[in-house]
A protein has these predicted regions:
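Short C-terminal tail/terminal secondary-structure segment
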Residues: 2-4, 96, 100, 236, ...
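Substrate-binding pocket helix/loop in short-chain dehydrogenase/reductase
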Residues: 100-103, 107-112, 216
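Residue(s) in the substrate-gating loop at a strand-loop-helix junction
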Residues: 153
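Short, small/polar-rich loop/turn modules that mediate ligand/substrate recognition or access, typified
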Residues: 185, 190, 246-248
Length: 262
């Protein structure tokens, strides 16, 4: 990765990159000139996605499940075979509980599902991709060797007692960011956390009326929903390598919702 140079040679993996926040990230990175490897669970990319990302010369779709840790090495090999290298990993794929339940009614099955996809999978995918980055030539001029961005949630620090497993998973992602940042800094690999607030996606469509009202009541200094492109812009800024002396940082994309206010 060469800081300040065109990014046409850089390759980014985006998990969950075919819809919602992930598609917003994929689009923004593609607009910035990245070649994008979109990873999602569907057998094939949704219609129009690859064309929207620059066509098959610039984008490719890979079916995969982040919670299938045994498949990670194969996924990394496929991306390298297709594009030649991996310069950026965006751990975006995530799920909410299929049913919100009070802590006293939560089930081990829901806990294991959410933690497997949101935390365990990204943790070990980071391991697999970092190993690949270390096999690649170091960047010249002190530029980052690679960038890893973990997409967490305001729920990493904000309590929701009807989806405890989700909050725990995102808190874990936040700690994983700091762990990997500390481990990989000397290797020239930067690791960041992007922490979205309330973003308009299919995942949040079911609570639209609730949050419309809360925005009207002042829940956030910026009284609007966030958009996938807002998250995409933050990820692209980090992926560019423009912050070579920073790692482990949290970038809030929540309209100021995280700010303590009286």
């Amino acid at each position: 990765m060469n800081q300040g140079s065109p990014v046409t040679d850089r390759v980014a993996i985006i998990t969950g990159g075919s819809r919602g926040i992930g598609l917003g990230i994929s689009r923004t990175l593609a607009e910035q000139g990245f070649r994008v490897a979109v990873v999602a669970t569907r057998p094939e990319a949704p219609e129009g996605v690859i064309d929207a990302l620059g066509g098959p010369e610039r984008a490719a779709y890979f079916q995969g499940r982040v919670d299938d840790v045994d498949s990670h090495a194969g996924l990394v090999a496929e991306v390298v075979e297709r594009f030649g290298s991996i310069d950026v990993l965006v751990n975006n794929a995530g799920v909410a509980p299929e049913e919100r339940r009070d802590l006293l009614e939560a089930t081990p099955e829901s806990y294991d599902r959410v933690m497997g996809i949101n935390l365990r999978g990204p943790y070990f995918l980071t391991q697999a991709v970092a190993r690949q980055m270390l096999r690649q030539d170091a960047a010249a001029g002190g530029a980052p060797r690679g960038v890893i961005v973990n997409v967490s949630s305001i729920s990493a620090t904000t309590v929701s007692t009807n989806r405890g497993e989700y909050c725990l998973s995102k808190a874990g992602v936040s700690m994983a960011t700091r762990l990997w940042a500390a481990r990989l800094a000397a290797e020239g690999i930067l690791v960041y956390e992007v922490r979205p607030g309330v973003i308009a996606t299919d995942m949040t469509a079911g609570v639209k009326d609730r949050y419309d009202a809360l925005f009207g009541q002042g829940i956030s200094p910026m009284p609007r929903w966030g958009q996938p492109s807002d998250v995409g812009g933050a990820v692209a800024a980090l992926a560019s390598g423009a912050m070579p002396y920073s790692t482990g940082d949290v970038i809030h994309v929540d309209g100021g919702m995280h700010l303590p206010r009286l």
